[in-house]
């Protein structure tokens, strides 16, 4: 294998770039320049413990996903924390993976964003090499492999925990996949949430979810769930009307990925806030 210096000094591309190979970009990078992978750079010594490593890097917190007939929604709050310190108020944690899928991130924010960028490139590379897009299951499995590759850093406190959602062109349905830090992949049904406020968000969605949701209904339920999570979890940020910071909300349907604009979210959030001035704990489901 030629080094970067060898081919850079000649001003040409190395043989690895000119030889047909596998359709996985991350596997190609592992063989050619593993130091550029998120998991390819060792942590410095002296951190002391996994919790200490986790406290030096901003952490993204709560992500929710809701399936509805003909699509799926993915939403995330905007707060990142370092221990008990608010590191950022307007971080974005929901990204398009490709035209028909999206990924939300919880865990170590910097590493997670890097994994998302590599995942986006992975899907684009596969499509260019193979001439077709990966299936929804194929995309979910590729992401699982990438998360598994980050296990060593996760064991040192820098975990990446994504939530993957996509529109399945074969079935015409929205699908949701969750992961653990070992790369274990699990398909979820109807709705799911990850991150520090996930237990509160999921509890809210249990009462709010309806199988006949429209995309607009799902957006309302997602913002309500994130509001409940922020109410009980200090690491989750609620909507900030003064700074005009709203959750990132995206829907994926047969028309592709669409992020809801802030103007649309502003109206939705204000209506929810108005209702909560009357009922602070949010909408209540009937007992029977």
Curated annotation (Swiss-Prot):
Q: Specify whether Protease is a keyword of the entry.
A: yes
**Reactions catalysed:** Cleavage of peptide bonds with very broad specificity
Q: What class of enzyme is it?
A: hydrolase
Query: For this chain's UniProt record, which GO biological process terms are given?
Result: modification-dependent protein catabolic process; proteasomal protein catabolic process
The pathway entry for this protein reads as: Protein degradation; proteasomal Pup-dependent pathway
The family database entries (HAMAP family) matched by this protein are listed as: Proteasome_B_B
Name the SUPFAM superfamilies on file. N-terminal nucleophile aminohydrolases (Ntn hydrolases) (SSF56235)
Q: Which Pfam families match?
A: Proteasome
Q: What does this protein do?
A: Component of the proteasome core, a large protease complex with broad specificity involved in protein degradation.
- What's the source species' lineage? Bacteria, Bacillati, Actinomycetota, Actinomycetes, Catenulisporales
Q: Which UniProt keywords apply?
A: Autocatalytic cleavage, Cytoplasm, Hydrolase, Protease, Proteasome, Threonine protease, Zymogen
Q: Which InterPro entries match?
A: Ntn_hydrolases_N, Pept_T1A_subB, Proteasome_sua/b, Proteasome_suB-type, PSB_actinobac
Q: How is its activity regulated?
A: The formation of the proteasomal ATPase ARC-20S proteasome complex, likely via the docking of the C-termini of ARC into the intersubunit pockets in the alpha-rings, may trigger opening of the gate for substrate entry. Interconversion between the open-gate and close-gate conformations leads to a dynamic regulation of the 20S proteasome proteolysis activity.
| Localization per Swiss-Prot or TrEMBL | Cytoplasm
Q: How does it assemble?
A: The 20S proteasome core is composed of 14 alpha and 14 beta subunits that assemble into four stacked heptameric rings, resulting in a barrel-shaped structure. The two inner rings, each composed of seven catalytic beta subunits, are sandwiched by two outer rings, each composed of seven alpha subunits. The catalytic chamber with the active sites is on the inside of the barrel. Has a gated structure, the ends of the cylinder being occluded by the N-termini of the alpha-subunits. Is capped by the proteasome-associated ATPase, ARC.
Q: What is this protein called?
A: Proteasome subunit beta
What's an example of a GO molecular-function annotation for this chain? threonine-type endopeptidase activity
Q: Which GO terms describe its cellular component?
A: cytoplasm; proteasome core complex, beta-subunit complex
Q: Which NCBIfam families match?
A: 20S_bact_beta
Q: Which residues form the propeptide?
A: 1-60
Q: Which residues form the active site?
A: 61
Q: What EC number(s) are associated with this protein in UniProt?
A: 3.4.25.1
Major place of residence = cytoplasm
User: Hey, which family's this protein in?
Assistant: Belongs to the peptidase T1B family.
């Amino acid at each position: 294998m030629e080094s970067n210096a060898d081919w850079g000094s000649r001003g040409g591309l190395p043989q690895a770039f000119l030889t047909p190979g596998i359709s996985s970009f991350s596997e190609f990078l592992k063989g050619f320049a593993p130091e550029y992978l998120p998991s390819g750079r060792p942590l410095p010594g002296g951190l002391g413990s996994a919790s200490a490593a986790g406290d030096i890097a901003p952490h993204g917190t709560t992500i929710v996903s809701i399936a509805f007939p003909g699509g799926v929604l993915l939403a995330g709050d905007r707060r990142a924390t370092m221990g008990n310190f608010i590191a950022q108020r307007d971080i974005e944690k929901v990204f398009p993976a490709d035209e028909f899928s999206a990924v939300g991130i919880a865990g170590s924010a910097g590493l997670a964003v890097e994994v998302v960028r590599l995942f986006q490139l992975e899907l684009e590379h596969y499509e260019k090499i193979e001439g077709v897009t990966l299936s929804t299951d194929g995309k979910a499995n590729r992401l699982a492999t990438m998360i598994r590759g980050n296990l060593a850093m996760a064991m040192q406190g820098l975990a990446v925990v994504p939530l993957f959602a996509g529109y399945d062109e074969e079935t015409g349905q929205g699908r949701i996949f969750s992961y653990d830090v070992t790369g274990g992949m699990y398909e979820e049904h109807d709705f799911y949430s990850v991150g520090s406020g996930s237990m509160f968000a999921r509890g809210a969605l249990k009462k709010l979810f309806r199988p006949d949701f429209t995309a607009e209904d799902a957006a309302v339920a997602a913002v309500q769930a994130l509001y409940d999570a922020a109410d009980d979890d200090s690491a989750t940020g609620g909507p900030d009307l003064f700074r005009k910071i709203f959750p990132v909300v995206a829907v994926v349907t047969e028309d592709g990925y669409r992020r809801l604009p802030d103007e649309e979210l502003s109206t939705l959030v204000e209506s929810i806030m108005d209702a909560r001035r009357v009922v602070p704990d949010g909408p209540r489901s009937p007992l029977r």
